[in-house]
From Swiss-Prot:
Alphabetized PANTHER family for the sequence: DOUBLECORTIN DOMAIN CONTAINING 2 (PTHR23004), PROTEIN RPI-1 (PTHR23004:SF11)
Sequence ranges of Acidic residues compositional bias: 357-418
Pfam families linked: DCX
Keyword Membrane found: yes
PROSITE patterns: DC
Compartment(s) of residence: Cell projection, Cilium membrane; Cell projection, Cilium; Cytoplasm, Cytoskeleton, Cilium axoneme; Cytoplasm, Cytoskeleton
Protein name (database record): Protein rpi-1
Superkingdom of origin: Eukaryota
Topology within the bilayer: Single-pass membrane protein
Bilayer-crossing regions: 244-264
Amino acid sequence: MPTPSTKKKVKKVAEDPLSSSGVSSLSGISSYNIRKISIYKNGDRYHRGVKFVINPRVIKDMEPLLNQVNDRIELSHGAKKLYTTDGKIVNSIKELEDGKIYVAASAQFIPMRYGEFAEKVWKPPSRKHSPIMSSDRIKTARTRSQDPSKRRQPQNSGSSAPTGSGVQRSRSVRTLAEDRKSRRDANPARPNVNGASNAPKKFDGARPKAPPARQTIPKPKKILTTSTTNKKPPTPKRKVSKKVLGAAAAAGVTVVGAAAIGAVAAAKRSTPKPIPTAVSDVSTASSIPIPNVTGAAEILEFPEEEKKIDMATIHRTPTPPVVASRPATAKAPGTPANRSATALEAKSVSQQPTPESSEEEEDEGNGDEDDDEEVEDDEEDAGSDEAEEEPSDEEEEDEETEEEEEEEEEEEEDDDESRVETPASRKSSSAVSFSGSTEEDHKKGDEAKK
């Protein structure tokens, strides 16, 4: 009988059967039927795969194997099935073959070429064979950047033997710094007008800040004022008939000015007509009509210029000049009695101080048409008549000639209506100046020559 010392002691394997040490210890025993397999992840062609060693004495069912696979391979719903590369399901451990590839899946198998593509390992590119960082190119960059006197000969030339072995470090950064320094040495600082040299610019300094933006205050818009805003509203005209003036003279009322004429006209008429709005502004020298801005049809009035008579000059003269009577017309031949009556009437008219009261009366046959004739009544300027300047002699003569022409036209109209005239209705000239009498004397001389 063999002694206990000669008996071969068999060690019990207490290690993990799936570990590499367990495989090495059990590799010599053929009776155990140990198998080595590789399991890949379903749907991942670049998966490296996990190697498993299956001992049928330890692992007798598929459930512990799937638990080990689930711990090593991460799937969305866990490792629930094993497939062959052809897509067949492995139902038991006995179907597993040694050295084969299997795929762990959750539900459905995805056919791919598993195990042929290993996962790529990304590494930085080598500078040894790249065309940009080749040694020849670096040498040309160094020689071009330096001055001819400071150029170095390449190390691989025949004159100098290689001093060291191995891959040399790139000197591109140093080349740029030397290039800038050589440029600065080659171009010295130019002196100023005063003789001081400018300090060289520092390339490493901080970037200068931009100047702050100026705050611009918006200018107020200019409002264009129209010329009509500053003007006073035009004074309305009041229509005064010459018949009213005659009635006032017959009643013994002395008409003194334009305001008095307006008052008499207002008393005479109970319902005055509406005041016109578009009336030209009356100035001391001349009257300028306002243009029609609205574009509507409008009749522009050109009233006669107002005659301003200085009251002081009238009171200084002892006797007013006597105006000669008008010569008789062909339509209404005058008698000596009529001529004397007109002379008396002219004297009475010339003694009146204002030019407005010198307007003559008209026949009653004119009716309502005579009431429509207008006399300008400027109430604002009535009080300042004496302060205004007298018009020139030439303007007075032009005004008098225009008035005489208008009176002659009125006489012709009256003669057509009624041939018979009375001394009261006889027309007389409203001119008080000397120019009117001279024109009448010329007319008389022409008739006498004829």
